[in-house]
Protein backbone atom coordinates (compact mmCIF):
# COMPACT_ATOMS: atom_id res chain seq x y z
CA UNK A 1 0.00 0.00 0.00
CA UNK A 2 2.87 2.32 0.81
CA UNK A 3 4.41 1.75 -2.65
CA UNK A 4 1.09 2.57 -4.28
CA UNK A 5 0.82 5.96 -2.54
CA UNK A 6 4.47 6.72 -3.24
CA UNK A 7 3.94 5.95 -6.93
CA UNK A 8 0.77 8.06 -6.94
CA UNK A 9 2.64 10.94 -5.30
CA UNK A 10 5.42 10.72 -7.88
CA UNK A 11 2.93 10.71 -10.79
CA UNK A 12 1.13 13.90 -9.68
CA UNK A 13 3.73 16.23 -11.26
CA UNK A 14 3.49 14.25 -14.51
CA UNK A 15 -0.28 14.83 -14.61
CA UNK A 16 0.16 18.52 -13.80
CA UNK A 17 2.77 18.99 -16.55
CA UNK A 18 0.58 17.13 -19.03
CA UNK A 19 -2.40 19.37 -18.23
CA UNK A 20 -0.25 22.50 -18.35
CA UNK A 21 1.13 21.83 -21.82
CA UNK A 22 -2.13 20.56 -23.35
CA UNK A 23 -5.42 21.92 -22.01
CA UNK A 24 -3.91 24.45 -19.61
CA UNK A 25 -3.19 27.07 -22.28
CA UNK A 26 -6.76 26.96 -23.53
CA UNK A 27 -8.14 27.25 -20.01
CA UNK A 28 -5.97 30.29 -19.28
CA UNK A 29 -7.14 31.88 -22.54
CA UNK A 30 -10.78 31.22 -21.58
CA UNK A 31 -10.28 32.82 -18.16
CA UNK A 32 -8.72 35.89 -19.76
CA UNK A 33 -11.56 36.04 -22.29
CA UNK A 34 -14.12 35.85 -19.47
CA UNK A 35 -12.45 38.81 -17.75
CA UNK A 36 -12.38 40.67 -21.06
CA UNK A 37 -16.12 40.05 -21.52
CA UNK A 38 -16.80 41.49 -18.06
CA UNK A 39 -14.77 44.56 -18.99
CA UNK A 40 -16.71 44.98 -22.25
CA UNK A 41 -20.06 44.60 -20.46
CA UNK A 42 -18.95 47.33 -18.06
CA UNK A 43 -18.18 49.57 -21.02
CA UNK A 44 -21.65 48.85 -22.45
CA UNK A 45 -23.35 49.76 -19.15
CA UNK A 46 -21.65 53.16 -19.05
CA UNK A 47 -23.87 56.23 -19.18
CA UNK A 48 -22.61 57.11 -22.66
CA UNK A 49 -20.83 54.06 -24.11
CA UNK A 50 -18.10 54.46 -26.71
CA UNK A 51 -19.46 51.96 -29.24
CA UNK A 52 -16.44 52.20 -31.56
CA UNK A 53 -14.15 51.17 -28.68
CA UNK A 54 -16.56 48.38 -27.74
CA UNK A 55 -16.45 47.01 -31.30
CA UNK A 56 -12.64 47.06 -31.18
CA UNK A 57 -12.73 45.18 -27.87
CA UNK A 58 -14.99 42.51 -29.37
CA UNK A 59 -12.47 42.11 -32.21
CA UNK A 60 -9.67 41.70 -29.66
CA UNK A 61 -11.78 39.20 -27.73
CA UNK A 62 -12.33 37.10 -30.86
CA UNK A 63 -8.59 37.11 -31.53
CA UNK A 64 -7.62 35.98 -28.03
CA UNK A 65 -9.95 32.96 -27.92
CA UNK A 66 -8.37 29.54 -28.41
CA UNK A 67 -8.65 28.08 -31.91
CA UNK A 68 -10.59 25.10 -30.55
CA UNK A 69 -13.31 27.22 -28.95
CA UNK A 70 -16.90 26.16 -29.58
CA UNK A 71 -18.66 27.85 -32.50
CA UNK A 72 -21.46 28.97 -30.16
CA UNK A 73 -19.07 31.24 -28.27
CA UNK A 74 -17.75 32.80 -31.47
CA UNK A 75 -21.31 33.31 -32.73
CA UNK A 76 -22.31 35.01 -29.47
CA UNK A 77 -19.37 37.38 -29.76
CA UNK A 78 -20.26 38.23 -33.37
CA UNK A 79 -23.88 38.84 -32.36
CA UNK A 80 -22.80 41.19 -29.56
CA UNK A 81 -20.49 43.00 -31.97
CA UNK A 82 -23.37 43.42 -34.43
CA UNK A 83 -25.52 44.88 -31.65
CA UNK A 84 -22.77 47.41 -30.99
CA UNK A 85 -22.62 48.22 -34.71
CA UNK A 86 -26.36 48.91 -34.64
CA UNK A 87 -25.90 51.25 -31.68
CA UNK A 88 -23.25 53.05 -33.71
CA UNK A 89 -25.84 53.25 -36.56
CA UNK A 90 -23.69 51.21 -38.94
CA UNK A 91 -26.90 49.63 -40.19
CA UNK A 92 -25.60 48.40 -43.56
CA UNK A 93 -22.55 46.71 -42.02
CA UNK A 94 -24.68 45.22 -39.27
CA UNK A 95 -27.23 43.80 -41.73
CA UNK A 96 -24.44 42.23 -43.79
CA UNK A 97 -22.77 40.69 -40.71
CA UNK A 98 -26.06 39.47 -39.23
CA UNK A 99 -27.12 37.87 -42.51
CA UNK A 100 -23.93 35.83 -42.74
CA UNK A 101 -24.10 35.03 -39.02
CA UNK A 102 -27.70 33.83 -39.42
CA UNK A 103 -26.67 31.42 -42.18
CA UNK A 104 -23.82 30.03 -40.08
CA UNK A 105 -25.96 29.71 -36.93
CA UNK A 106 -28.76 27.95 -38.79
CA UNK A 107 -26.31 25.47 -40.34
CA UNK A 108 -24.36 24.86 -37.14
CA UNK A 109 -27.02 24.96 -34.42
CA UNK A 110 -30.29 24.52 -36.30
CA UNK A 111 -33.22 26.83 -37.00
CA UNK A 112 -34.71 26.55 -33.49
CA UNK A 113 -31.57 27.27 -31.45
CA UNK A 114 -31.54 30.29 -29.14
CA UNK A 115 -28.56 31.86 -30.88
CA UNK A 116 -30.26 31.52 -34.27
CA UNK A 117 -33.43 33.10 -32.92
CA UNK A 118 -31.49 35.94 -31.27
CA UNK A 119 -29.61 36.57 -34.52
CA UNK A 120 -32.86 36.63 -36.47
CA UNK A 121 -34.39 39.09 -33.96
CA UNK A 122 -31.39 41.38 -34.24
CA UNK A 123 -31.53 41.17 -38.05
CA UNK A 124 -35.19 42.21 -37.89
CA UNK A 125 -34.26 45.18 -35.71
CA UNK A 126 -31.50 46.14 -38.13
CA UNK A 127 -33.92 46.11 -41.05
CA UNK A 128 -36.39 48.15 -38.98
CA UNK A 129 -33.69 50.73 -38.19
CA UNK A 130 -32.79 50.90 -41.88
CA UNK A 131 -36.45 51.50 -42.75
CA UNK A 132 -36.78 54.17 -40.07
CA UNK A 133 -33.59 55.97 -41.08
CA UNK A 134 -34.50 55.95 -44.77
CA UNK A 135 -38.05 57.18 -44.12
CA UNK A 136 -37.02 59.97 -41.77
CA UNK A 137 -34.32 61.17 -44.16
CA UNK A 138 -36.88 61.56 -46.95
CA UNK A 139 -35.93 58.59 -49.13
CA UNK A 140 -38.33 57.46 -51.82
CA UNK A 141 -40.69 54.61 -51.01
CA UNK A 142 -38.87 52.33 -53.47
CA UNK A 143 -35.76 52.65 -51.30
CA UNK A 144 -37.21 51.95 -47.86
CA UNK A 145 -40.05 49.58 -48.77
CA UNK A 146 -37.81 46.46 -49.25
CA UNK A 147 -36.35 46.93 -45.75
CA UNK A 148 -39.84 47.30 -44.27
CA UNK A 149 -41.02 44.18 -46.08
CA UNK A 150 -38.00 42.20 -44.90
CA UNK A 151 -38.64 43.38 -41.32
CA UNK A 152 -42.23 42.19 -41.56
CA UNK A 153 -41.14 38.80 -42.92
CA UNK A 154 -38.53 38.25 -40.21
CA UNK A 155 -40.83 39.15 -37.33
CA UNK A 156 -43.66 37.10 -38.79
CA UNK A 157 -41.31 34.10 -39.03
CA UNK A 158 -40.30 34.63 -35.40
CA UNK A 159 -43.93 34.87 -34.30
CA UNK A 160 -44.91 31.71 -36.16
CA UNK A 161 -41.95 29.69 -34.88
CA UNK A 162 -41.94 30.59 -31.21
CA UNK A 163 -42.15 28.16 -28.32
CA UNK A 164 -45.66 26.83 -27.73
CA UNK A 165 -45.90 28.22 -24.18
CA UNK A 166 -44.02 31.46 -24.78
CA UNK A 167 -47.12 33.65 -25.06
CA UNK A 168 -48.62 32.28 -21.84
CA UNK A 169 -45.32 32.80 -19.99
CA UNK A 170 -45.15 36.38 -21.27
CA UNK A 171 -48.75 37.09 -20.24
CA UNK A 172 -48.08 35.62 -16.77
CA UNK A 173 -44.99 37.83 -16.36
CA UNK A 174 -46.94 40.92 -17.42
CA UNK A 175 -49.79 40.07 -15.04
CA UNK A 176 -47.36 39.51 -12.16
CA UNK A 177 -45.61 42.84 -12.81
CA UNK A 178 -48.98 44.57 -13.08
CA UNK A 179 -50.11 43.09 -9.75
CA UNK A 180 -46.81 44.07 -8.11
CA UNK A 181 -47.25 47.64 -9.33
CA UNK A 182 -50.84 47.84 -8.10
CA UNK A 183 -50.00 46.37 -4.68
CA UNK A 184 -47.27 48.97 -3.99
PLM regions and their residue ranges:
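N-terminal alpha-helical interaction modules that lie
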Residues: 2-78, 83-90, 95, 162, ...
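Short coil/turn linker motifs that delimit alpha-helical repeat modules in TPR/alpha-solenoid proteins
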Residues: 21, 28, 69-70, 112, ...
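Short coil/linker segments at helix-helix boundaries
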Residues: 43-46, 91-108, 128-177
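Short, charged, amphipathic alpha-helical segments
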Residues: 52-56, 74-79, 117-120, 141-149, ...
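Carboxylate-rich helix-loop segments that flank metal/cofactor sites and access channels
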Residues: 96-99, 117-121
Amino acid sequence: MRKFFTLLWLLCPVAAVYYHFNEGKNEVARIQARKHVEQIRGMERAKEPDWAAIIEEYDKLSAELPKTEAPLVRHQIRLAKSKAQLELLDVAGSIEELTSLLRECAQTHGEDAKITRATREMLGKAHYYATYLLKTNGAAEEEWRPFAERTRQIFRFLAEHQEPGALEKYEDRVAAEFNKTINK
